[in-house]
Every structure is written in structure tokens, then in C-alpha cells.
Design a protein with these regions (language model features):
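Acyltransferase
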Residues: 182-237
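N-terminal beta-alpha supersecondary unit
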Residues: 1-66
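Stable alpha-helical structural segments in soluble proteins, enriched in small hydrophobic residues
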Residues: 46-50, 85, 103, 191-202
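Generic hydrophobic alpha-helical segments
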Residues: 39, 43-46, 50, 99-100, ...
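Surface "functional belts" at beta-alpha junctions
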Residues: 22, 34, 89-189, 222, ...
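DPxDG-like acidic metal-binding loop motif
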Residues: 61-95
Length: 237
């Protein structure tokens, strides 16, 4: 089985092509303004480097968020378009699940975080489970770093924070004595982790038709909020 991986949920865009059981072909770059065109070019480069053909791709594993709305829409739209054209299914994976999976052997409660901008973070809590996995034990929510820190403090147990959201607001989270931080190398979702989650899902046929895939954003998009603000200012003026 060969999967194409797409992750545009954060400031770092990552793409990969992987045959199960073999090392993946990977490309990562800062998300540019012309992200959609860049994704198409990188996918073509991955195909050339791997010597695979588009017709050999069995599915598309895509990070559906939460994360930066514009980037998510670009990545998910590309995944849906390509999967529809090739007649293959999609494996949707949460950005927070990817971050948490990188810490699956940690005995502490893991809190995965993604910078939500506007002074907030998307986050969810996880615990290690038998068999080398990690399970989400909370809803995916958005909140201020102060609110997240207060929730962690109420747990009265050691917690490992992972993700860019944790490092961006490290000063706030460091006020909680039981907080520990994962390294900056896992600040963003890692494509190999996406593949490790997606392949078992694919083998279990946990697919989603392209037309049914959408982003997980939790709150109104920044674009929608900015539009509402502009409309309100016009009315006041």
C-alpha cells in the first residue's frame, strides 16, 4: 500500500509519499502564499524521486486540523481534488493526534497544542494505552494559555506539553509546577507520525470519501471573523 501524506495545518507544510514498511520520501517547507501551487509541484517531485506513479497511490492521508484555517483549506482541498481524480479514498487525521503520537511512550498525561493565533491554542489531552499507542481522553477545544494552564494545574499530576502552542506560551505554562515540555523538534506535526497513524487506519478501511472530508477548526475562521469586524466598522461609520 502506498499513501500520499499532506499536512498544511501549521506554519510548516509537509508532504510525503510512503509505501508501507519502507522509509518515506519527505519534503517540508514554510507555508508560502502560493501554497496550492507549491503542493502540486512537490507532489510531482516526490513521485519522480520515488519512481512511483500516481496510479500506484492507494490513498491520501491528510491532516484535517485543528490549525491555521487558510492552510488547512488548501491542503484538504488539494487532497480531495487529487483523491477524486484518482478515485482513491482519504484517511483524515487530527493535527493534535499526530503531535501526541510522537509522545506515545510517555507515562505522563500528554497535552498536545497547536497555536490558534489570537492569543489562543487548540489542545487535547492524551494517555498512553497498552500496545504502544496513545488515546485522546478529552475533547479538542480552544482556549487561552492561562485557561489551559489552570486546567492542567487542576489535574494535580505531571503533564507533558507538546507542540508549537506550548513553546509559544512557555512563560505561561511554566508557572505550573507539574508541567514538562517536549523538545522543539516536535513543535509541528511530523509526517512519519502521520503515516504511522494512517496506515493502520487504511488497513482497517477507516476511509472517508473525498466529498465527505472537511477541516476540524473548532472556532470561526479568522477570515470570517475579520469580515464580521469590517462589516461592524462600516455600520459604526
Amino acid at each position: 500500500m502506498i499513501l500520499l501524506g499532506i499536512d498544511t495545518a501549521t506554519e510548516m507544510t509537509s508532504l510525503g509519499l510512503c509505501r508501507y514498511g519502507e522509509p518515506p520520501f519527505l519534503v517540508s517547507f514554510p507555508g508560502p502564499k502560493n501554497q496550492l501551487e507549491s503542493i502540486g509541484e512537490v507532489v510531482q517531485r516526490l513521485l519522480e524521486n520515488s519512481e512511483y506513479h500516481r496510479s500506484q497511490i492507494n490513498g491520501v492521508a491528510v491532516d484535517v486540523g485543528p490549525g491555521l484555517f487558510t492552510g488547512l483549506r488548501v491542503g484538504v482541498s488539494f487532497a480531495k481534488s487529487l483523491a477524486g481524480a484518482l478515485g482513491i479514498p482519504i484517511v483524515p487525521v487530527s493535527s493534535l493526534d499526530i503531535l501526541a503520537f510522537s509522545q506515545r511512550n510517555c507515562p505522563k498525561t500528554v497535552v498536545a497544542t497547536v497555536d490558534a493565533r489570537r492569543g489562543e491554542v487548540f489542545y487535547a489531552m492524551y494517555r498512553k494505552v497498552p500496545g504502544g499507542g496513545i488515546a485522546r481522553i478529552s475533547d479538542i477545544v480552544v482556549g487561552s494559555p492561562e485557561d489551559v494552564a489552570a486546567e492542567i494545574e487542576s489535574l494535580a499530576e505531571s503533564v507533558l506539553l507538546v507542540g508549537h502552542g506550548a513553546h509559544k506560551y512557555k512563560e505561561v505554562f511554566s508557572t505550573v509546577s507539574q508541567v514538562h515540555f517536549a523538545g522543539s523538534a516536535v513543535s509541528y506535526p511530523l509526517m512519519p507520525m502521520l503515516f504511522e497513524i494512517a496506515f493502520p487506519m487504511a488497513f482497517s478501511e477507516e476511509f472517508v470519501p473525498p466529498e465527505s472530508v472537511d477541516v476540524v477548526y473548532i472556532r470561526d475562521a479568522d477570515a470570517r471573523v475579520n469580515f464580521d469586524v469590517r462589516q461592524a466598522l462600516r455600520k459604526d461609520g
